[in-house]
Amino acid sequence: MKFGTLFIALLLAGSTAQAQIPTPTSEAGPWSLDDCIRYAHEHNIQIQQQALQVEQRSVELNTSRHSRLPDLGANLGTNFSFGRSLISNNTYADNNQVSGSLGVSASLPVFMGGRINHEIAAGKLSLKAAAQDLDRIREDVSVNIMSYYLDVLVAKELVDVAEQALALSTQQVERSREQVRTGKVAESVLYENEALLAADEYKLTQSRNDLSLSLLALSQALNRTSAEGFDIVAPTFDSLTVESMRHLRNPAEVLSYALDNRPRIQAERFRLEQALRAVRMSRAAYYPQITLTGGYGTNVYHSFATGAVNPAFGRQFRNNSTEYVGVAINIPIFNRMATRNSVRTAKLGVRSQQLVLTEAEQTLQKEIETAYYQADAALLKYRSAEKALNSAQVAFRYEAEKYAAGRSTTFDYNLSLIHISEPTRRSYI
C-alpha cells in the first residue's frame, strides 16, 4: 500500500512513471534517482524472473501456432530370423533370412472444433498479461526505490538541520563563556548552554546514524554488493515542484486514466479474456474432429536358403511399396460428462477472474483516494510548517538581538532556537 500510494501521489501531481530499458550504471560518484531506478531494473530478481515468464509465454504461443502444421514421421525396421520355416511346397526347411521395412506417415488436423484458434488467441492474451505483469513489477520496483530515495533525502535534510542547530548552540556557548568572563551573566547560564550543546550533538549523531541506515536500506533495495561509499545526489527543485501540488487532479479523473493504463488492471483484463477463451476451448470438445492422414511404406527381404530366389533390392523396394491416404472423423457421443464438466469449470474460472478484476479496480480506487487526501493534507502541512518557520525565524532574530543586549534570558533564547528547529524538521518529514 505504501508503494502504490506513493506512485498515485506522483500521478496526482501530473508525473508519469515509464518503464525504461536498463542500462549499466557507474559505481563511482553520487547516484541520481534515474541511476538508482535503472540499476534496480537491471539487477532486481523479480524483474528477471518475470522476464523469463514472458519468454516462456512466447514459447507457448509459438507452440500453439505450430499446432496447425502436420505431424510427419518415419520408421525403419530390420528383422533376422534363423532356423526352419514353412516353405512354398508346404514342408519345413532351413530358411535363414533377413527382412527390412521403411515407412513414412503424416497426419494433418483439418477441423478440431475451433480449439486451435482459441488456443492461439488464449496464448496471445497470456503473453500480453505476462508483459503487463513485467511492467507492474518494474513500476513497483521504481516506486520502492523512490520511497527509499526519499527517505535518504529526508535524512540528509535532517542532518543539515541538526548541523545548523549545533552551529548556533556552539556560538551560544562561546558567547556565554565570554559573558561569564566579563561578569555579564552567571556561570549557570554557561552550564545551561553547554547542556543544550550536548543535546544538539546527540541529535546530530542520531541524524547521521539515521542517514547511514537510510543509505544502507536503499543500497540493499538496489541489490548492490556493498553499501560502502554509496551516496546519492539530491534532485533540483524549484517553485514549480510545490506549485504543481496545488493543482491536484481530481480522483475520478485519475481513476479513469489509471483503469486504462495501470499494468495491474490491464493484466487482469487480459486474464479475463483468456478465461473466456478457455470456455470456448472446452466447448470445442462437443464438435467432431477431422484429421487427414497419409503414408508410404515398403519392405524387402533376403533368404539364405539353398536354392532360394532373391529379387534385387531395388525391384523389391519398388514392387513391395504401398501408399495410403485417409480421413479420420472422431465424433463425440458420450464421455461420462467430462466435456460438460470441463465447460462448467471454465465458466467458474471466468467468474473467479471477474472477481479478481473487480477487487483490483476497487483496490486501485482506494489507493487513489487515499493518496489524494494524503497529498492534500501534506500540502496543508507543508504550508503550515512554512509559515511557522518564517515566523520563528523573525522571532529568533529579535530574540537574539535582545539576548545580545542583555534584555533576554537564556531560557527564552534557547526556546526561540527550538521554535526554529521544529518547523524546519516538520517541513521535511
Predicted regions located by residue number:
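Small/polar-residue-enriched beta-strand and adjacent coil segments characteristic
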Residues: 30, 71-85, 90-136, 266-278, ...
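Amphipathic alpha-helical coiled-coil segments
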Residues: 49-64, 137, 141-160, 178, ...
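Bacterial Sec-dependent N-terminal signal peptides
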Residues: 1-27
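Periplasmic alpha-helical coiled-coil/stalk elements that build and connect Gram-negative outer-membrane
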Residues: 140-257, 374, 378
